[in-house]
Amino acid sequence: MTTSPSSAARKPFNRLLLTGAAGGLGQVLREALQAHANVVRASDISAMAPPAGKHEEVISCNLADKAGVLALANGVDAIVHLGGISTERAFEEILGANISGTFHIYEAARKHGINRVVFASSNHVTGFYPQDQQLDAHSPRRPDCYYGLSKSYGEDLATFYFHRYGIETV
């Protein structure tokens, strides 16, 4: 069996959206995701490096801006959602970036027919357990801060969007 050059170069996605692209993990994934998509659309509210060639787009977006997120997700095949505040802050800050922002990501996915989202959760979802206690998939969540609570909400939102709209989250 032979593989033609065009099929050998085929990538699973035409365009991937990466939120939180200015963060530590986001900066690493900007380059790594290019092996999986023809174009990586990198987004963050913070300043980012310029596009690294024709296979990358850089777009600034505040996840609390519903219309902005809807426009940001237009034309993408899947979303890698790392965006938001990654440390404990005042609830009002967490609300806009992490809770409303994650809702806006899933709504944009639904409205644009995007059926795959990668959502980064956190160990803070189970942070009130003693560190030496073993947990399994059935252990109740016990968020230890507003940030952990926002990630717990994101997990529930992902489950809701799967059952209601068929959007898969990993």
What are the roles of these predicted feature ranges?
Residues 53-65:
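Rossmann-fold cofactor-recognition segment
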Residues 63-97:
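NAD(P)H-binding glycine-rich loop region in Rossmannoid oxidoreductase-like domains
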Residues 19, 43, 79-82, 117-123:
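SDR active-site strand-loop-helix element
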Residues 12-36:
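N-terminal Rossmann NAD(P)H-binding glycine-rich loop of SDR-like oxidoreductase domains
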Residues 104-145:
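Conserved Rossmann-fold NAD(P)-dependent oxidoreductase catalytic core, especially the SDR/UDP-sugar
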